[in-house]
Every structure is written in C-alpha cells, then in structure tokens.
Amino acid sequence: MFTGLVEQVGEIIGVRQTDAGRELRIRAAYSDFLDGESIAVNGACLTVREHGTNWFATAAVTTTLERTTIGEWKQGTRVNLERALRASDRLGGHIVQGHVDFVSRVRAVDRASDAVLIDLDIPASSESLFVPHGSVAVDGVSLTVNELLPHGIQLSLIEYTLRHTTLGDLTPGARVHVEADVVAKHVRRLLEPFLRERSPLDSLTDFSLEH
C-alpha cells in the first residue's frame, strides 16, 4: 500500500524486452532496498528484483504492460517513485494500492495565478468514481479532484507538486496512469446490485409518468 506522496523522481537507465514482458533498470537514490519489496513506479506497484548503488531492477509482465504506459518507457524517461507504506508512517495523501485502473489522456494544461490546472479524460465506465474534492492518484501522485468535467476531471497542482514530481512535465496529449479512490470503488461495487434491480413500484411509476 502507498500514500501517493512521491519520495523522489527516478530515471529509466535500462530497458530489456523479454518473452514474459519488460525488464527495467531505474536510477534511484535509495540506500536500503530489499530485494522483493514493493515500489510504486508512476503509480504502478512493481517488485524490486535486484538492486545496487543508486539503482534497482524490476519487471512488468504482459498484463501490466497492457494496462499501463510502461511499454512506452525508454532510457531517460523520468518516473515517480514511492516505497510501500510502513505501519508507523503518516498517511499524508490517501490510500493508494498501486493498481492502475486506466490510462488517461491529458486534455489541457493551463496556468492559473497560483497553480496549474490539468484536465484529464475519464472513460464513461469510471465517471461515477470521481466527486469534487475527492481523491485520485495520477502517475502515483495523490491529488484532489478540483472539478468534474464532461467525461473528465480537472486537477489543480501547486508549485511544490510540479517541482517534485513528473507532473510538471505534462503537456496536452500525454498519457498518465489513473487510480481511482479505493473507497469509491468498493462503495460502487456494493451498490451495483441495488442499482441494477428495479422493483415493481419502479415500473408502476414509469407507467404513471408515461400516461
């Protein structure tokens, strides 16, 4: 589990295609890695397979490549990094699982007086997971939904976030990982049976309105 508070920005320094997927080597200023531990790389939970001084190696299988932008990463790509949350740590962002729900396209980037506004496309099937001032993870960064848009959301990014994550590099058309709030996903799942079912009273009401 993660919080969406990026610890540092790493850099892809090696990529190798394999039969199982893709192996990555990433430059990172961590000194106490453990092989097998989890790390969020642009919000995707991956496993440290090997590490050395200022680098670690990880891999993404085919299923992960299909659901993320990892297949597009190349040497020099900058990525947001966050190690897994300790039980004693502060939960400064929100609960992030590292499970990318979908890849979104940046619709617009506009500078306001004290922030940068970023508009993202949201698929119709996921629109109900977002509410104004709700939480969302974008490329692993915990953010607040500033406003709901037609088939999209608007985010407001402060200067600190722009400087300390890769989100300051975003331009219209860029593709980003989006993970909706896990609480919203569970609530929607619990309500789905009730939303699908229609009682006889519903049918009677519809008939009355039509006649």
Task: For every predicted segment, state its role.
Residues M1-H211:
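Conserved loop->alpha-helix
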